[in-house]
């Protein structure tokens, strides 16, 4: 008899994520603004988490790259160059995304001011991210099991494809909705005059204006990548169902904290957070089901 699983964990885990997100969307549809009034309050620790919290999610890119690398190398030397190329690309992706989303804070940390400071300081800020991700491929190389190279390759490919698709779908939906952010609304004399629920969409109003890119939450797309952690746990040398469940619990806690912080820091409403999580989770479910065997 087969034990049906999704993303290396029992289906009940997927049902739990989907149920919580739907409940959040329903509650947010009625009380989005009131929830933000009650919870939104910028703090230093919230700002720190907003800057560096995505680091853990982006670690998944070089980890996925190492999955593919180790699987291809196991298949033979003829794949070694391809493996190295993919590993470098995935490492670069983590560094690029981190620098793109949070680089301004790091450059500020190093005292860089565009047009005034030495360009060398900007290079150092890139090096900061390069160093932060350096441990990932080395550790993953040691702990991943290459006895089934096809599973390794498909696991890494699923995470990469799902991550890239999620990011682009999210960017497209932000333009479709063009929903004003709470942090923008509270700068107005009458915040409710421009408040819109998630279904009250005004396509392409946002343009390049980030103040109108509240729905769905892009940061929750990043955070929800952590739900693929059990997929990586499932290719460990000493893997077990218990470890997969532990990874799922860790991912869930991370996503909840991240989601709360997005509201707390005035960036999103509850429905934005839940939609960002749900959309990303569905994409990862679909891609992993297409790439990886879901029965064992």
Predicted segments — roles?
Residues 25-28, 95-96, 163-170, 254-258:
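Alpha-helical transmembrane segments of multi-pass membrane proteins
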Residues 56-70, 126-140, 224-228, 277-294:
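Hydrophobic cores of alpha-helical transmembrane segments in multi-pass inner/ER membrane proteins
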Residues 2-130, 177:
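N-terminal transmembrane-helix/juxtamembrane module of multi-pass inner/ER membrane proteins
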Residues 11-20, 83-87, 125-129, 150, ...:
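Alpha-helical transmembrane segments of integral membrane proteins
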Residues 2-18, 196-296:
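Membrane-embedded catalytic cores of phosphoryl/pyrophosphoryl-handling enzymes
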């Amino acid at each position: 008899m087969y034990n049906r699983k999704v993303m290396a964990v029992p289906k009940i885990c997927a049902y739990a994520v989907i149920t919580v997100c739907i409940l959040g969307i329903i509650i947010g549809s009625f009380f989005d603004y009131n929830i933000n009034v009650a919870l939104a309050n910028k703090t230093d620790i919230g700002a720190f988490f907003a800057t560096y919290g995505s680091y853990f999610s982006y670690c998944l890119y070089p980890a996925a790259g190492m999955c593919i690398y180790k699987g291809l190398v196991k298949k033979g030397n003829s794949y070694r160059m391809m493996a190295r190329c993919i590993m470098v690309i995935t490492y670069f992706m983590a560094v690029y995304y981190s620098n793109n989303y949070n680089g301004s804070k790091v450059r500020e940390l190093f005292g860089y001011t565009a047009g005034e400071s030495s360009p060398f300081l900007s290079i150092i800020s890139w090096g900061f991210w390069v160093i932060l991700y350096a441990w990932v491929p080395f550790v993953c190389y040691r702990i991943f099991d290459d006895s089934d190279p096809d599973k390794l390759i498909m696991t890494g490919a699923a995470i990469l494809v799902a991550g890239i698709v999620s990011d682009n779908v999210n960017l497209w939906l932000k333009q479709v909705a063009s929903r004003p952010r709470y942090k923008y609304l509270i700068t107005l004399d009458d915040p409710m005059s421009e408040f819109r629920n998630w279904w009250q969409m005004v396509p392409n109003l946002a343009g390049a204006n980030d103040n109108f890119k509240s729905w769905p939450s892009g940061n929750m797309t990043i955070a929800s990548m952590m739900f693929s952690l059990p997929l990586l746990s499932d290719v460990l040398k000493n893997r077990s169902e218990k470890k997969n469940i532990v990874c799922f619990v860790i991912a869930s806690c991370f996503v909840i904290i991240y989601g709360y912080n997005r509201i707390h820091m005035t960036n999103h409403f509850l429905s934005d957070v839940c939609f960002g999580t749900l959309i990303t989770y569905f994409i990862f479910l679909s891609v992993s089901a297409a790439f990886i065997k879901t029965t064992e």
